[in-house]
């Protein structure tokens, strides 16, 4: 196994341990035992428990950032509504394809420490700004109802986070496409005019 595969192996097992036990209860000994590597091997790749936890969260942030594509009202192949649904679908899929990391992101990472809280807040603020700008653009095109785009962005993120929290934490059995349809319907009954 090469170094990148070994690193990925440790990350995957650490994610599983964090998802099962929570950050504070997770121990490096359990991570290395689950990964089948020596403790020294862990430290070749990661400084400490926090470093591996932070990398897991950072990778999820990156995947989410790549999942969202700017809506193009001039796209002749995909309607605005289809593009919006595609973005919702991409976000939902990214978070539900890895429920362990989503659990970590929505529950275990919150309140870890002030520096990590700032990192999470920064991610949510950046997501909110991107969504807010998309909503302002949509308002200019008549695709989004007039109103406070900042509030709309917070409400939208809150709805998505709560839906995924319920699915991941409570084990509610909702098909991804049903979640996409319901979220799109919710937005369509509110500010969306697509």
Predicted regions and their residues:
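Hydrophobic alpha-helical connector segments
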Residues: 55, 69-97, 152-156, 177-180
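Amphipathic alpha-helical packing segments from all-alpha helical-bundle domains
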Residues: 62-69, 114-140, 150-154, 162, ...
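Generic hydrophobic, amphipathic alpha-helix propensity
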Residues: 6-14, 31, 52, 56-67, ...
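Helix-turn-helix
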Residues: 9, 17-51, 55
């Amino acid at each position: 196994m090469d170094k990148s595969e070994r690193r990925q192996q440790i990350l995957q097992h650490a994610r599983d341990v964090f998802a099962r036990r929570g950050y504070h209860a997770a121990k490096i000994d359990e991570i290395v035992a689950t990964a089948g590597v020596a403790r020294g091997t862990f430290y070749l790749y990661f400084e400490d428990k926090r470093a591996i936890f932070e990398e897991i969260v950072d990778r999820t942030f990156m995947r989410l950032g790549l999942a969202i594509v700017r809506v193009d009202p001039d796209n002749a192949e995909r309607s605005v509504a289809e593009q919006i649904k595609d973005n919702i679908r991409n976000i939902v899929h990214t978070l539900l394809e890895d429920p362990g990391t989503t659990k970590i992101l929505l529950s275990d990472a919150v309140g870890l420490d002030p520096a990590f809280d700032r990192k999470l807040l920064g991610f949510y603020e950046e997501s909110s700004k991107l969504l807010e700008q998309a909503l302002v653009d949509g308002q200019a095109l008549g695709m989004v109802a007039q109103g406070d785009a900042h509030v709309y962005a917070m409400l939208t993120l809150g709805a998505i986070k709560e839906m995924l929290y319920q699915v991941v934490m409570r084990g509610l059995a909702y098909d991804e496409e049903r979640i996409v349809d319901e979220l799109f319907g919710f937005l369509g009954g509110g500010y969306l005019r697509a």
